[in-house]
Amino acid sequence: MNCIFLSVLFIWYFFFVYVKNLSILQYDKAKVLFIQNNFEPLNNNMLRVPLNILRKRTYVVKNKKNGVPFQIFLSSENDEGLYYELNPENVEKVLNLIRPKLQIDNGDVELVDIKNNDLYIRLLGNCVTCSSNSITVSHVIKKTLKMYIRNEQNQEPNVIITNFDEINEQNIQNCLSQLKPYLDFLKVEVIIKELVNNKENINNYVCLKFLNIENSSEEINIPHNVKNEITERLKQKFPTLTVNFEN
């Protein structure tokens, strides 16, 4: 009898423990699901706000990177074929578009003269003293004037930068002055013996002569590398110029 009673108690105890553990397990599982559902990044409204802000900020940065750079000229004028007539007033209008950029670096540009289809322009200030910058500025000025100016035959003007493009003794001497320290070391100077300059830029010719600073009557021998350097400097400034040496 006692054995039967103990067996019944054992069965009831086992059943009670099993039911209790099952309820606890279901509660923990529900709690885990609650945590998972409420902290899912894609379903959490609290996390969506900062993500949206980040996306907007990223979009703004991308827009800044893809922004159109500052442009001086309006392309619509040229695209429609609207040009200014070749005269001093219209040339000044176009140059006024360029001047603000040049004046930032203490430079400027001025109209010298207009002869037929030749447009003579002079660089001023730092536009001349900085050789590397002057080449870029000259190119921009030429391109801009040719873009907006036309003569009576609807032709582009022949833009001549007098500081560099015009072949004359002063510009040649200015180019040679860049080599003056080296020539002074050799105790020689370079003079222009003959200069032929055609308006058509055909057969332009210059003949140079070396003189001894201490004794001009004394003959001197100049190394070929010095002559080559002088020739290259002049050809860079005046591509149509032929350079020869008397001695």
From Swiss-Prot:
<keyword id="KW-0479">Metal-binding</keyword>
<keyword id="KW-0411">Iron-sulfur</keyword>
<keyword id="KW-0408">Iron</keyword>
<comment type="similarity">
    <text>Belongs to the NifU family.</text>
</comment>
<dbReference type="InterPro" id="IPR034904">
    <property type="entry name" value="FSCA_dom_sf"/>
</dbReference>
<dbReference type="GO" id="GO:0051539">
    <property type="term" value="F:4 iron, 4 sulfur cluster binding"/>
</dbReference>
<keyword id="KW-0934">Plastid</keyword>
<dbReference type="Pfam" id="PF01106">
    <property type="entry name" value="NifU"/>
</dbReference>
<dbReference type="GO" id="GO:0005506">
    <property type="term" value="F:iron ion binding"/>
</dbReference>
<dbReference type="GO" id="GO:0005739">
    <property type="term" value="C:mitochondrion"/>
</dbReference>
<keyword id="KW-0004">4Fe-4S</keyword>
<keyword id="KW-0933">Apicoplast</keyword>
<dbReference type="InterPro" id="IPR001075">
    <property type="entry name" value="NIF_FeS_clus_asmbl_NifU_C"/>
</dbReference>
<comment type="subunit">
    <text>Homodimer.</text>
</comment>
<protein>
    <recommendedName>
        <fullName>NifU-like scaffold protein</fullName>
    </recommendedName>
</protein>
<dbReference type="GO" id="GO:0016226">
    <property type="term" value="P:iron-sulfur cluster assembly"/>
</dbReference>
<comment type="function">
    <text>Binds and transfers [4Fe-4S] iron-sulfur clusters to target proteins.</text>
</comment>
<comment type="pathway">
    <text>Cofactor biosynthesis; iron-sulfur cluster biosynthesis.</text>
</comment>
<dbReference type="GO" id="GO:0020011">
    <property type="term" value="C:apicoplast"/>
</dbReference>
